[in-house]
Structures are given as C-alpha cells and as structure tokens.
C-alpha cells in the first residue's frame, strides 16, 4: 500500500478564547476531541502516519492528552513551530515578534519528518470522511507532470458557515476540468437563511452558497518544501520589521504559484458538512452535529478514545466476575483486600462503580 501522512497544524492551541484550549475541548459522547475524529477518519481512509505541528512548550501536555494515545494506533511524529525559527540573518530584524508566522511556516517545519505525500489540516476543524478518502486516493496516485501537483479539498460554502457570526472563506474559481484557477479571500460572510451574504454598512453582497471554498485541507508532496523555504526567505526579506502581524499563509503562497504557472491544483469535491470552532458558541453546534452524524452512522462515536475505554471496561468486568466467584466459593479461606474493598463499593453504589471504571 502506498504511504501518505496526515499533518495536523496544532501550534495555535490555547491562543484564542482567553487561553481556553479549544482543540482539546470534548465534543464527542465519550470525551472525544475534534482531532480524534480527524485521525480516525484518516486512518480509515488509508493514512498510516500522523505528524502534529505544535509549540515546544505544549509538548508534554499535548502528548499526555492526545499524542501518546494516538501513537498506540498509528505512527506519530512531531514538528515544532516557533516564532524564533527563522534564518539567522533575520533574527535581529524581527526580535519583537510574538505572533506565529502562519501556515506556510507550519508546514515548512515538517520537512525533516515527512518524506511522502501528505495532507495538511487544521487541528480544530472537522472535515468529514469523504474528504480524507478523496485526498488519500489522489495522494497515492499522483500523475507525473511538468508542474508540481497539489490537491485541495473544496467544500460547499453553505456547509461551512457559522450560526454565530461572520467568517472568512477562500472562495475558489475552478475550471471545467476541476482545476483551481484562483482563491478569493472573502471576509465576514454570514449565514442568512439559505443565503451567504457580506454586509458592509447598507450594502449587502450575496455569494453563491454552493461555491467551492478552501478550508485549509491541502495535499502536497515533499518537493513542496523547497518552494516553501525559498518563499519564506523572500517573505521575510520584503516584510517590514514593524509589521509584527504579517503571516506566510499557504493559500496566498499557492495563489502566487498558480499565477506563476509553477503548480497545478486539483480541486477534490466534498459535500460533507464542515464543522469548526470559530466562536466559543460554535462548540455546542459542533457537539450536536457530531451526535447527529453518529445517529446517522456517518461518524464513529467511538473514534480512537473509546478503544481505551473498552479495555478498561473489560478489565472491570473481569474483576467483578472474580469477586462474585469468590463470594460463591465458601471453601476459600479469605478474599483479597482489594476485592473486599471493591465488593463494599459495589454494594454502596454499583452504578457509580461502573461509571467510574468506564472513563
């Protein structure tokens, strides 16, 4: 089987919503987080390696909360995105910089741990099963060509809007062959019934709600790292030292490469509903959406986390059977202290005991 890697950009954990780690907030019935579902769907599609792009200071907590658990199911590697990780000649120029450099640098950080075609996603977005299947199929059968081959999973605009406010989306212009021609970054798109609109004062502009949009789900090959490296140095060179918010962003990079004729970008269509946490209030929407998908059997409510829960449940049931056997065996001289304690706890509140040993 051909190899393909999933790269999850998670260096921004904790930087929004007053320090709340939104990516790690449970959204599934068994405590799953959004990344659980992304990894689960990716493994089902065929991806056999996951690379987490994180900050070094988050490594310990990240591994404890999700990384070590995922590593039991699939090969895991880490790449570290730091503001200071720039060529030495630019260090003094941007000495006051605290804002991350953007998705382009995040991917560039993976160059030493990725040597196969890879799919890039955001840590706090849910993309749906079909998106991973389409991407894996493309990445494991990339045709040879003069230009660098890239793919992008395009989502339907109306399937990506928030009920809680305006969002920024990259609206895509695609030709009749499904090739990307242009990405138009559009701000403050609001959901208005079945419409997608942008309001500026008294002026309201309506957009085709069925337009394909980019949600930062890109399929790339290792040769893209050289392009990113050269482009990042050019970006740093032309960025003013006082511009502490400028970012090296993948959609912008690919847009420029399209104009130069350096790359070809195949747009893979997905009709799946996209879910993400743009606003704090979006979390409840995501929780309900996940529950609905599970009820429709389009999503595993178990994901990766539940495998661990099942193991604990089996261990508990085995201990309970042993205790009951001991109680029936009157010839046994004594019951171990651990089992006596378990028996007393079960007698007081057996349902609580089952619950406590199931998470």
Language-model features, listed with the residues they occupy:
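A C-terminal functional module that forms or caps the active site or interfaces directly
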Residues: 229-262
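Conserved N-terminal catalytic core of the sugar/cofactor nucleotidyltransferase
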Residues: 1-8, 32-120, 127-128, 132-134, ...
């Amino acid at each position: 089987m051909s190899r393909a890697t999933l790269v999850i950009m998670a260096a921004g954990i904790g930087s929004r919503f007053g320090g709340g780690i939104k990516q790690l907030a449970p959204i599934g019935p068994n405590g799953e987080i959004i990344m659980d579902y992304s990894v689960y769907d990716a493994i089902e599609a065929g991806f056999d390696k996951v690379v987490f792009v994180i900050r070094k200071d988050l490594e310990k907590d990240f591994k404890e909360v999700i990384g070590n658990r995922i590593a039991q199911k699939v090969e895991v590697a880490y790449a570290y995105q730091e503001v200071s990780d720039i060529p030495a000649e630019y260090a003094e120029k941007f000495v006051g910089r605290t804002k991350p450099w953007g998705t382009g640098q995040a991917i560039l950080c993976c160059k030493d741990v990725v040597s196969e075609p890879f799919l890039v996603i955001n840590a706090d977005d849910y993309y749906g099963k079909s998106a991973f299947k389409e991407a894996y199929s493309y990445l494991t059968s990339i045709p040879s060509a003069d230009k660098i081959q890239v793919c992008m999973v395009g989502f339907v605009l109306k399937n990506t809007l928030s009920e809680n406010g305006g969002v920024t989306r990259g609206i895509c212009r695609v030709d009749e062959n499904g090739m990307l021609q242009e990405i138009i970054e559009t701000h403050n798109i609001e959901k208005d019934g079945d419409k997608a609109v942008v309001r500026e004062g008294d002026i309201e502009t309506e957009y085709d709600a069925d337009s394909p949009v980019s949600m930062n789900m890109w399929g790339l090959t290792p040769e893209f790292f050289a392009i990113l490296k050269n482009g990042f140095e050019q970006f740093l060179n032309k960025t003013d030292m006082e511009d502490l918010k400028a970012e090296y962003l993948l959609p912008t990079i690919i847009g420029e490469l399209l104009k130069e004729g350096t790359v070809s970008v195949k747009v893979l269509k997905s009709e799946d509903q996209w879910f993400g946490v743009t606003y704090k209030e979006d979390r409840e929407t995501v929780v309900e959406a996940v529950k609905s998908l599970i009820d429709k059997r389009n999503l595993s409510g178990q994901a990766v986390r539940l495998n661990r829960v099942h193991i604990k449940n089996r261990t508990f049931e085995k201990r309970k059977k042993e205790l009951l056997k001991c109680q029936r065996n009157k010839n046994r001289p004594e019951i171990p202290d651990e089992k006596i304690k378990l028996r007393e706890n079960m007698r007081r509140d057996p349902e609580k005991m089952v619950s406590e040993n199931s998470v």
